[in-house]
């Protein structure tokens, strides 16, 4: 398998992950000094959701009454700039539990802040230490906002452009040079396609597959894949990964890199 993307700067490597539906509030661990960059669009979404009837909100969220009522109250009382929780602590799903950011060391926080980007239907792109409030909105939700047919159209190329931003990531760069931008994809298809659709020739987009062999085929199971994605973020932060090839050493929970089933676009880890 050929290797590539051997640039020197850490900022060239980006990791994308999905958000989690379940969110918590933690205003004590870290003070939030910044908010995500697309707050104007977030405000548009908030206003649109608040303008829906309760029945419409519940249909949008595809949930039971208890969860719908909780989120209707959240949106009615929502202040996007107060009582903020760092995003990496706010999302409370399986991959975040296994990432275990609450016990990161200082260097690991700095690493994820530089490299990790959380894709969100509500905020667009979120850096780990940016402050967010609990919300419920999935990218595939049927939300026709601002004349757009859905949220993929609403966000357009914004997520790609923001993920690719960095001191050494220049959208006008010469894509023929061997210093391509590298994205490690740990997101679900629902979110990764917000980026994939806009990839340029010089971009290197590597999806990590975490699976088990069943009858000679790689089978990826949802819960276990989420666990492994979280552990991969933690692993990358612990080794200060700067090149994609470094993540091939990932060995948590019995996984091992399988070069025969991997390619330039997919890194396959089997256990």
Which residues does each PLM region occupy?
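Active-site helix-to-loop segments that bind/position phosphate- or nucleotide-bearing substrates
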Residues: 16-103
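Extreme N-terminal starter segment of soluble prokaryotic enzymes
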Residues: 11-15
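N-terminal amphipathic/basic-hydrophobic helices that include classical n-h-c signal peptides
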Residues: 1-10
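Internal, well-folded beta-alpha domain core
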Residues: 101-263, 268-271
């Amino acid at each position: 398998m050929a290797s590539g993307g051997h640039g020197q700067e850490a900022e060239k490597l980006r990791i994308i992950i999905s958000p989690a539906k379940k969110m918590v509030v933690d205003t004590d661990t870290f003070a939030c000094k910044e908010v995500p960059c697309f707050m104007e669009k977030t405000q548009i979404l908030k206003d649109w959701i608040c303008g829906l009837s309760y029945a419409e909100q519940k249909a949008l969220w595809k949930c039971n009454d208890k969860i719908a009522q909780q989120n209707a109250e959240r949106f009615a009382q929502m202040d996007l700039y107060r009582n903020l929780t760092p995003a990496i602590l706010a999302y409370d799903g399986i991959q975040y539990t296994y990432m275990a950011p609450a016990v990161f060391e200082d260097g690991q926080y700095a690493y994820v802040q530089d490299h990790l980007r959380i894709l969100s239907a509500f905020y667009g792109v979120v850096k780990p230490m940016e402050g967010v409030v609990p919300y419920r909105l999935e990218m595939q939700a049927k939300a026709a906002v601002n004349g757009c047919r859905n949220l993929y159209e609403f966000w357009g190329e914004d997520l790609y452009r923001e993920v690719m931003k960095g001191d050494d990531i220049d959208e006008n760069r010469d894509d023929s040079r061997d210093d391509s931008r590298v994205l490690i994809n740990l997101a679900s298809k629902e979110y990764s396609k917000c980026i994939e659709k806009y990839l340029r020739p010089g971009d290197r987009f590597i999806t990590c597959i975490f699976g088990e062999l069943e009858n000679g085929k790689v089978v990826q199971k949802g819960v276990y894949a989420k666990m492994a994605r979280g552990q991969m973020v933690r692993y990358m932060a612990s080794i200060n990964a700067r090149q994609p090839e470094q993540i091939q050493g990932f060995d948590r929970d019995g996984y091992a890199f399988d070069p025969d089933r991997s390619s330039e676009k997919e890194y396959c880890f089997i256990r």
